[in-house]
Curated annotation (Swiss-Prot):
This is Cytochrome c-550-like protein. The lineage of its organism: Bacteria, Bacillati, Cyanobacteriota, Cyanophyceae, Oscillatoriophycideae. Disulfide bonds: none annotated. Gene3D superfamilies: Cytochrome c-like domain. Heme c binds at residues 75, 78-79, 129. NCBIfam families: PS_II_psbV2 (TIGR03046). GO terms for biological process: photosynthesis; respiratory electron transport chain.
Length: 165
């Protein structure tokens, strides 16, 4: 009786170990947000303009989804759909990002803005946009937010539009 009980425990332990090895060692695929799938055309990594020279940096759908999620947690109160509730004439559209001083239509400049926000003409700091310090978010997190904003400005319908009718 004791040997049979011991054998059953041994077999169950082996089965659990095999199950853990099989299921826990397979790569975990990060969830891709449905908005990113539907509107940002990011099934394969997409090149986001890195600097004014036009160099590109690739971002996966997972990176953009993480950027969207972080944007939703921290920026959405003022920037629903790429709008700007504090200053409606300055949205997050690609046109408005290009028109800022300095332009914010590339990853490096938009990250610099998020780290040290200035008003649209660049003449002074803004108190309305939260400064994202390195203690708060990593460089990759801020780049994912910026990549999400830039890709949405390129691809998402009605992103940053002043009047949707």
């Amino acid at each position: 009786m004791l040997n049979k009980s011991l054998l059953i425990r041994f077999v169950l332990t082996i089965l659990i170990i095999v199950q853990v090895i099989i299921f826990d060692t397979q790569p975990v695929q990060a969830a891709v947000d449905s908005y990113v799938k539907r509107y940002l055309d990011a099934e394969i990594p997409v090149g986001i303009k890195l600097n004014k020279q036009g160099e590109l940096k690739n971002f996966s759908a997972e990176d953009l989804s993480e950027g969207k999620q972080t944007f939703a947690k921290n920026c959405l109160n003022c920037h629903v759909g790429g709008a700007n509730l504090v200053n409606p004439s300055v949205s997050l559209s690609l046109e408005k990002l290009k028109g800022a001083t300095p332009p914010r239509d590339d990853l490096n400049n938009l990250v610099a803005f998020l780290r040290d926000p200035m008003i649209y003409d660049g003449s002074s700091y803004t108190l309305f946009c939260r400064q994202i310090t390195e203690n708060w978010m990593s460089q990759q997190e801020v780049e994912n937010i910026a990549a999400f904003i830039l890709r949405a400005a390129q691809k998402a319908p009605y992103w940053g539009v002043e009047n949707v009718r």
